Amino acid sequence: MSTNGLDEYWVPEHVKDYLRKLGFVLPLDDMEPWIRSWDDWMSARGDFYDYRDKDGMGRVYAVHRRSIHPAMRVCKEWGSLLLNEEVKVVCEDQKATDWINSFFSSTNFMNAAQTTVVRAFGLGTGAWALWIDLGKRKVRIRHYDARMVIPLSWDEDGITECAFVTRAFYRGKSVDQLQMHLKGGMVFSPDSSSPSTPSPEYAEGLLTNESEETYRIVTVCFDHEGNELAPVGILPVYDTGCPFPTFGIVKPAVTNTRVDMSPYGQSVFADAVDAVQAVDLTFDALINEIDLSKMRVFLSDVLFDREQDGNKNVTIPFGKQDCTVFRKVMSTEDTIQEFAPALRTSGQIEAFRVALQMLGDLTGFGINYFDMDDSRGYVKTATEVSSDNSALMRNIRRHENSLEGSIVSIARAVMHASRSFGESIPDEGETHVQFDDSIIQDTAAEKEQDMREVGVTMGAWEYRMRWYGEEESVARARAAEIGTSSVSGGSGK
């Protein structure tokens, strides 16, 4: 990703025009300015960070404000708190549980998903969607952020049809790849897909078919001029046979107050932009204070060597040295004089601390999450602040509830598509996500406490269900097996 944002990928206008001619209204048009703004804050770009000023002589010069990228830090913190390798999908059938978690592990899904969550919490929306390799008969998951996601059909219950736009490369040239995940009631005809040649029996390339309710993945490619391409090996329309969405939309549990009724989400720092500015403003002021307070050394003219330069006898300079050594012209007194300005960092640090507290409070972490530790001088860890931070715990649960539906949706779609390729996967039944809260909770202590309760207020199978994610029948069987083995081992002594 380019540091200046010039090379970042955004949906090209010819792709938007193609979707409009198919009859779709694009909610991206209203949200894109906000998404671009949030993207700039995450990358510390824009007029706040790079601007021009004038000196006393009226000369214009460029100024760059230093940044610790607070907006990105907020998003990364949420990503690390919500998703890691210990997060598991738990199905009603244990074999389905084992299969889907093995799939996620082998495809490194959770690591990539954490990055998706980081971008989604920063830009307001993200997604993961099925990607089918028919040649290898493999199912994979592709990850997208708000720049590449275009909802096509939605209501209060969520997004039911969606398009994803990415850059791909075909024969050494970049192409724009549009993939539409359309519900079974809408059949896409590749012959009439071109908006320039509509067919009378199709409504702009789409035909209602009430008899089918499965999802189809429609792929269209364009060159940089907007001309449609037909790359070898790309199937224009693929019926997944899946009756539920073949994608999952990732959004933070934050109400979108920027565009009313939009299917897009809102950035977690959308209402904290002033706090982001305050953090970087105080950080830059702190660095400037230290830089301007460096010791200055003034040396008498007699300490400098001289050399002949034509008809002139010039002083040999020491070098720039960041403007810390100065020459006193025509001076022989006090050959070496030091000047050390007093540091005012205590006030700067206090302002920086207040800005961090405000940022944490406005982004859902609570006022103490980014607070600075007096003994160590930097921010505390999540575990240190979570014990007395009810705001953080409440918001974690809200975001987990929002994220669970997206993970379950893509997990079910993966299992359904894999069955069509011959994978023996039982029906998953009721499915939920077991999140890992060990980062913010003392999980070891909780497990130990539950272990003490086994045989008193909790059965061994209940312990296994909670801590090993096993379905009830498996947990009961394994608990009984372990108990029998213990009895047999004891009787043999």
Which functions belong to the PLM regions below?
Residues S43-Y61, R327-L362, V379-G405, E428-M465, ...:
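Extended, non-catalytic structural segments that build the interaction scaffolds
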Residues G226-S387, Q434-S438, D442:
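Extended, charged amphipathic alpha-helical segments
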Residues M1-R171, S491-K493:
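Extended, helix-rich architectural segments
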